[in-house]
Every structure is written in structure tokens, then in C-alpha cells.
Regions:
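Hydrophobic alpha-helical transmembrane segments of multi-pass inner membrane proteins, especially
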Residues: 8-10, 14-22, 26, 32-328, ...
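Transmembrane alpha-helices of multi-pass inner-membrane enzymes
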Residues: 216-219, 433-470
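Long extracytoplasmic/lumenal interhelical loops at the membrane interface
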Residues: 341, 345-378
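Alpha-helical membrane-protein architecture signal
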Residues: 139, 330-334, 347, 363, ...
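Transmembrane helix boundary and interhelical junction motifs in multipass membrane proteins
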Residues: 152-158, 348-354, 365-367, 438, ...
Length: 473
């Protein structure tokens, strides 16, 4: 049994409960174990999670492998049922009401998806290079993601973390690179869409993304083919033409430089297709597809942002990107959160002495924004201690995943790691104003039984698989 991970888990649970006490405390409260208060309810869920963890450790580890697909199917059916019978709670239909208990199936679908992926990828016939296998992996990840995104965007985005596990298991690096490029294209394209280059009618966002596409295409030719001549032709030719076009636009006749870039992109793609046919190498053709896909994503992301996203989602993104300052609206949570953290100073104001949190200036201060309670009451020292505990947990998960004797254990371990990383980075980023507010909890800290049980199940299934790793060779 990996006792280091269990000790870190217990410490996070304890610190998390005290943070819930601090975030939900009212001056009239006298008893933290009053089960009518959030602190009291969280205590009950913690005790239940200990019992749940114990049961998971007592089960035979082969059961998780044996029933992986059944668990996945069961949770997917529960997600479908949730769509139709869940009541409207704060504009979200993602909770099932079972008497006095409310459960969020999306939290439990994470471990089910991780088990299904581990089961499928541990099959003897599985190979990442097989396109049918890749389609099946995409289905296992995207199906719950699509079911959840109908009700809650934040919980659905967590499933993108599984691609980090896929990269560890041999997914081509270009796929991960494409995902990173998509984020960069979206941010740059949206952020600088209305900003022009000097005195020209050229939007910086569109120009910058198309320039990156041209440079990336040339760079990929060098990385994958080690051919200097086509690399020089693509990068050098593009930069030379754009320099001449800029000088003409600046000093002769102003025009949109993006028009020139469209022509350059067409020429580069045509050149890559020519190289692919003449040298009979598919790599050139795939690089051309990457360029076309990048251009398509640029213009479709603009449509997605303006036509698909809800107005409040657009405002949240604009606030994060510095395009708007809505301190009384969409930016209120983040602004108050940063004030609370900043007011904590080095050592904090002390347990239950936070003014921003006690006076309820920070909405969701014991759920999604609970880290601001830690920052205000425990200061920089306490916040650093909490982050160090999470760092120890992350490093331990990597070590335990790497020592697995079977693909099933390793894949599941890296799935757990990926989910924890996503939650940690996005939640802390939300509180600090570095990422959009998408409403996902901080593991073991945020108030709520569903998230606590979901993370406990994720972790303790992995610990049980690890305990039996020598029998899974």
C-alpha cells in the first residue's frame, strides 16, 4: 500500500475541511459540527469518503479491470437520465436529487471513463497507430464530454485532460502540439481582433495567427524531414513577401496584409502538395493539412466565440484576456478573490478572521473559490504549504504510475494524474484571474460531497490497483 499518498490525501482532506469552515462560517455559528451548516455537512461527507476509500481498498483489484466497461456504460446511462430528470439548480441541470442528498453524476463519470480507457488500451491487440483504435479512444472521451457540455461547460472540459495520458502512452506529439496551437490561435485571434497594425487596416490577431501558421509549416518541414531547402523557401519566402507588402501598405497604398497572407498560405499548401507528390512522402501532405486546419480553426473560432458562446461566457473570456474590465459583473468574483488573497499578506489574518470571506464579498468562497479563503486566512505561507502538498501528490502519482507492471494500471494512473492536474491548474488560475471562470472544484478542498467522493474514488481505485501490481504482470 502506498502510505505516502494516503497521508497526503488525509492532510488535504483535513486542511480542506478547515477551509470550508472558514469559507462558510457566519458570526452567529457556534458549532462546526452542526449538521445544518456546510462545515457539518462536509464533515459527514468526509467520514463517508473514508468508508468509501476503505471499501475500495478491500475489493479485489481484478474487479476494476473486469467491470470497467459495465461501470462506464452505467455512468453514461446515468448522465443521459440526468439530462431529462435533473431539476434546474442555478441555471444548471446537472444534479440528481435523491431525498436529502444531491449528486452530480459528472463527477463520477471521470473515474468510469478512466477505467474504460485503461481497459481498452491494455488489450493485447491495442496500438495507438491503428486508426480504429484512435477513433474508439476519441469516442470513449468525447461521449461523456458531449453529454455533460449540454449542461455544464467546466465539467466537460475536464475530459480534455485525458489527452495528456494519451501522449504518455504514445500519441504523436503533433496532436498535443495541435491542441496547444488551437489555444494560442483562439486567444491571439480573439484578443487582438480589433487592434490594427500601425496605420494599416490589418488586424493584429488575424495577421499574427496566419504568420504563425506559415512559420509552423516551415518549421515542421525541418523537424520531420530535415530538409533545409523547402524550409528556407517557406519561411524565408513568406517573411520576405510580407516585409515588402508591409512597406507598400505603410508608405504607398494602405491595404490589409491578411490578403497577402491568404495568397501565401495557398502557395505554401500547394508547394507542400507538390513536394509530397514529387518525392512521394506523405509527411508534406500532412503538414499542408495542418496548415489548412489551422486556418479553418482561426475563422471558425471567431464564429464560435461570437455566435455559439453565451454572452456571459464571452464576457468572462474578455475579462480574463484584458479586453474588458467588468468589476461589478463578470469580473466581480475574480476581483474580490484577488483582494482577499492579497489582504492575507505573508502569514494571513488567522483562522476565521478573514474579512473578505466572512462578510461574503467573494461568491462561492467555499466551493470554486475556496483557495481565496486559504490565501486570506493563512496568507502566502499557508497557500504555499497547500500547493506543496498538491505538488507532492502529483509527483507521487507520477512515481506510482511509472512503477505499474501492467498497461491497465499505468493508463489508469496517468488518467488520475491528468484529472488532478487539470483541476488544480484551472481552479487556482480562476482564483488568480489567469484562466476563465468555468466552475470546477479544487480537489479535496471545495465544499460538496460529489466532488469529494469522485476524487476519493479516483485515487483509491488507483491505490488498490497499485497494491496488486505484482500480480498483474
Amino acid at each position: 500500500m502506498d502510505w505516502v499518498t494516503i497521508v497526503v490525501y488525509l492532510l488535504l482532506i483535513v486542511f480542506g475541511w478547515f477551509s470550508v469552515c472558514g469559507g462558510s462560517y457566519d458570526y452567529g455559528d457556534r458549532d462546526f459540527l452542526d449538521f445544518s451548516t456546510r462545515a457539518g455537512k462536509q464533515f459527514v461527507w468526509i467520514i463517508c469518503s473514508f468508508g468509501l476509500g476503505f471499501v475500495l481498498l478491500m475489493l479485489d483489484d481484478s474487479l476494476y479491470d473486469m467491470f470497467s466497461y459495465l461501470i462506464y456504460i452505467g455512468l453514461m446511462l446515468l448522465l443521459i437520465v440526468t439530462i431529462f430528470i435533473a431539476p434546474d439548480t442555478k441555471g444548471s441541470r446537472s444534479w440528481l436529487i435523491l431525498g436529502p442528498v444531491s449528486l452530480q453524476p459528472a463527477e463520477f463519470a471521470k473515474f468510469a471513463t478512466a477505467l474504460a480507457l485503461a481497459k481498452y488500451m491494455s488489450a493485447y491487440s491495442f496500438t495507438m497507430k491503428n486508426w480504429k483504435s484512435s477513433l474508439m479512444l476519441a469516442f470513449l472521451i468525447l461521449f461523456p464530454m458531449l453529454l455533460i457540455i449540454l449542461r455544464e461547460t467546466g465539467s466537460a472540459l475536464v475530459y480534455s485532460a485525458f489527452f495528456l495520458m494519451l501522449y504518455r502512452e504514445g500519441m504523436p506529439g503533433v496532436v498535443l502540439f495541435s491542441g496547444i496551437c488551437a489555444v494560442v490561435y483562439f486567444v491571439v485571434g480573439i484578443r487582438f481582433d480589433a487592434v490594427m497594425i500601425a496605420d494599416t487596416p490589418t488586424p493584429i490577431g488575424e495577421f499574427a495567427v496566419l504568420l504563425m501558421v506559415l512559420l509552423f509549416a516551415g518549421g515542421m518541414v525541418w523537424v520531420y524531414k530535415k530538409r533545409w531547402e523547402p524550409t528556407r523557401n517557406i519561411i524565408g519566402g513568406s517573411l520576405g513577401v510580407l516585409l515588402v507588402a508591409y512597406l507598400i501598405s505603410e508608405y504607398v497604398v494602405p491595404f490589409n496584409l491578411v490578403w497577402v497572407q491568404w495568397g501565401l498560405c495557398a502557395l505554401v499548401v500547394g508547394y507542400l502538395v507538390f513536394l509530397s507528390l514529387s518525392e512521394r512522402h506523405l509527411s508534406y501532405f500532412l503538414i499542408g493539412l495542418f496548415a489548412l486546419g489551422s486556418i479553418g480553426f482561426l475563422y471558425s473560432s471567431d464564429y464560435f466565440f461570437n455566435k455559439v458562446l453565451e454572452p456571459h461566457q464571452q464576457i468572462r473570456i474578455k475579462v480574463v484576456l484584458g479586453m474588458e474590465e467588468d468589476l461589478a459583473g463578470a469580473g466581480y468574483n475574480v476581483n474580490q478573490s484577488k483582494i482577499a488573497i492579497g489582504s492575507g499578506g505573508l502569514t494571513g489574518k488567522g483562522f476565521l478572521n478573514g474579512t473578505q470571506t466572512k462578510l461574503k464579498y467573494v461568491p462561492e468562497q467555499d466551493t470554486d473559490f475556496i483557495f481565496c479563503t486559504v490565501g486570506e486566512e493563512e496568507g502566502f505561507v499557508g497557500s504555499t504549504a497547500v500547493l506543496l502538498l498538491f505538488l507532492i501528490l502529483i509527483l507521487r502519482l507520477i512515481a506510482v504510475a511509472e512503477r505499474q507492471q501492467s498497461p491497465f494500471g499505468r493508463v489508469y494512473g496517468y488518467s488520475v494524474l491528468s484529472i488532478f492536474l487539470f483541476h488544480l491548474f484551472i481552479n487556482i488560475g480562476m482564483v488568480l484571474g489567469l484562466t476563465p471562470v468555468i466552475g470546477i472544484p479544487l480537489p479535496f478542498f471545495s465544499y460538496g460531497g460529489s466532488s469529494l467522493w469522485g476524487f476519493t474514488i479516483l485515487l483509491f481505485i488507483f491505490l488498490r490497483i497499485d497494491a496488486g501490481r505484482n500480480r498483474r504482470i
